C-alpha cells in the first residue's frame, strides 16, 4: 500500500489534498550525489547496472522529496535491444551505429524478447521498488516510435531530420514497417515494466515538433495510440502519460489515444490546454526548466502562476506539477527543493471542494 499516492490519484482525476510534483530527468547531473555515482561508471553502464540505476532513481526522493520516482534508464535502450550499437558521447549526446537507411537495414533489426534484452531494466525496477518501500509511486517509460525512428535513421540527434524525412516521404511503406517494429518493442517494454512493478508509465515523443500536423497524424500518432491501447487493455488501472514535446496544436488528438494524462511543454498556456481538453485527461507540467536558474522567490512566483492558471480543481480534473521538459544539469538542487516545497505548501488551496 503506497504511503503517498497523490501522483496516481491526480492522473486518475480523483480528489487530491494538493498537487503532486515530480520532474523529468530528476535523477541526474544537477545532484552532486548523482555525479558521485556517475564518476564510477559511464552512462550506458549506469543504465545497465541495476544496483546503480536503483540508487540514482531513489536519490531525488530522499534528497528533494518529490511525489514520484522515475526509473533511471534511457529511451535509446530500445534501438540497442533491437541490434543497434549505442554510445553516449560526453557533451555530444547519443550515437547509434549503423543507422537504418535501407529496406535491408530495416529487415536486420530484430524484435527481441524484452525480458531477455532489457532484463536489466526490470531488475533495476525490482531493486528500486524495495528501496522505495512504498513511499511513492514508480514511473516506467519508453520513447515514442517516431522519436526512436529518428534516432535509428539519423544515427543520433539531428537539426533537420534529413534522413528520417527522406524515408517517410520517399518510402512511406518502409517507414511504416520500421515504425511498426519499433512500436512492438515499445509496447512489450512498457508491459514488462508494469509486470515487474511500476505504477504508471510515460511515453516520450521528444521530436514530435519535427513533423507537420498531417505527418504527425500519419507517422507518429497511430503508434502512440497502439501502445496506449495495448497497455490499457492489459492493465486498465495503470495510468499512461503521453508527453509529445511542443505538439501544442494536436492536444485533442493526443487525448484521443486513450491516455490518462498529457505532459505539456512550457510554451503553451496551461489554462488554454485545460479549457480545450475540458478535463478529459489530467495535465502534467509545465514550468519552463530555465526558471530554476532564477531566485527561489521568482521560482515560487512563476510556479504560483501555473497553479493559478490551472485553477480550482473539480471532481474530474487532475494536475501533476512538472517542468515543461527535463531539469537542466547545472541547476542548483536547492532551487528545485524550493519549488517542491512551494507546491506542497501552496497548492492545497486549489483543491478545496
From Swiss-Prot:
Keywords: Cytoplasm, Decarboxylase, Lyase, Porphyrin biosynthesis
Places the protein is found: Cytoplasm
Sites marked Transition state stabilizer: 74
GO molecular function, one term: uroporphyrinogen decarboxylase activity
Reactions catalysed: uroporphyrinogen III + 4 H(+) = coproporphyrinogen III + 4 CO2
EC number: 4.1.1.37
A single GO BP: protoporphyrinogen IX biosynthetic process
Top-tier EC class: lyase
Pathway this chain belongs to: Porphyrin-containing compound metabolism; protoporphyrin-IX biosynthesis; coproporphyrinogen-III from 5-aminolevulinate: step 4/4
List of residues binding substrate: 25-29, 74, 151, 206, 325
Entry-linked Pfam families: URO-D (PF01208)
Entry GO CC: cytosol
Summary of subunit composition and partner proteins: Homodimer.
Family: Belongs to the uroporphyrinogen decarboxylase family.
Alphabetized NCBIfam families for the sequence: hemE (TIGR01464)
Entry function: Catalyzes the decarboxylation of four acetate groups of uroporphyrinogen-III to yield coproporphyrinogen-III.
Identification of the protein by name: Uroporphyrinogen decarboxylase
Source organism (scientific name): Chloroherpeton thalassium (strain ATCC 35110 / GB-78)
Amino acid at each position: 500500500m503506497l504511503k503517498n499516492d497523490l501522483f496516481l490519484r491526480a492522473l486518475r482525476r480523483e480528489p487530491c489534498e494538493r498537487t503532486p510534483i515530480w520532474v523529468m530527468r530528476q535523477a541526474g547531473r544537477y545532484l552532486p550525489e548523482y555525479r558521485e555515482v556517475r564518476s564510477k561508471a559511464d552512462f550506458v553502464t549506469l543504465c545497465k547496472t541495476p544496483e546503480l540505476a536503483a540508487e540514482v532513481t531513489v536519490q531525488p526522493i530522499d534528497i528533494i522529496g518529490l511525489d514520484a520516482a522515475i526509473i533511471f534508464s534511457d529511451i535509446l535502450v530500445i534501438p540497442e535491444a533491437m541490434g543497434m550499437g549505442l554510445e553516449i558521447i560526453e557533451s555530444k549526446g547519443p550515437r547509434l551505429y549503423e543507422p537504418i537507411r535501407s529496406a535491408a537495414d530495416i529487415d536486420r533489426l530484430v524484435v527481441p524478447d524484452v525480458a531477455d534484452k532489457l532484463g536489466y531494466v526490470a531488475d533495476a525496477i525490482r531493486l528500486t521498488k524495495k528501496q522505495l518501500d512504498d513511499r511513492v509511486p514508480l514511473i516506467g517509460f519508453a520513447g515514442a516510435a517516431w522519436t526512436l525512428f529518428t534516432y535509428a535513421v539519423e544515427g543520433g540527434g539531428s537539426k533537420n531530420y534529413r534522413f528520417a524525412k527522406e524515408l517517410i516521404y520517399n518510402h512511406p511503406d518502409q517507414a511504416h514497417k520500421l515504425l511498426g517494429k519499433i512500436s512492438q518493442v515499445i509496447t512489450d517494454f512498457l508491459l514488462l515494466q508494469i509486470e515487474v512493478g511500476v505504477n504508471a508509465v510515460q511515453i516520450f515523443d521528444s521530436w514530435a515538433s519535427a513533423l507537420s500536423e498531417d505527418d504527425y497524424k500519419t507517422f507518429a500518432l497511430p503508434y502512440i495510440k497502439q501502445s496506449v491501447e495495448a497497455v490499457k487493455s492489459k492493465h486498465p488501472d495503470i495510468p499512461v502519460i503521453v508527453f509529445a514535446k511542443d505538439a501544442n496544436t494536436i492536444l485533442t488528438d493526443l487525448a484521443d489515444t486513450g491516455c490518462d494524462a498529457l505532459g505539456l511543454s512550457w510554451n503553451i498556456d496551461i489554462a488554454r490546454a485545460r479549457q480545450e481538453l475540458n478535463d478529459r485527461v489530467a495535465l502534467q507540467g509545465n514550468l519552463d526548466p530555465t526558471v530554476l536558474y532564477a531566485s527561489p522567490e521568482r521560482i515560487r512566483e512563476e510556479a504560483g502562476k501555473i497553479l493559478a492558471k490551472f485553477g480550482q480543481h473539480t471532481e474530474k480534473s487532475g494536475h501533476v506539477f512538472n517542468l515543461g521538459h527535463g531539469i537542466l544539469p547545472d541547476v542548483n538542487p536547492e532551487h528545485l527543493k524550493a519549488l517542491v516545497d512551494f507546491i506542497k505548501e501552496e497548492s492545497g488551496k486549489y483543491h478545496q471542494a
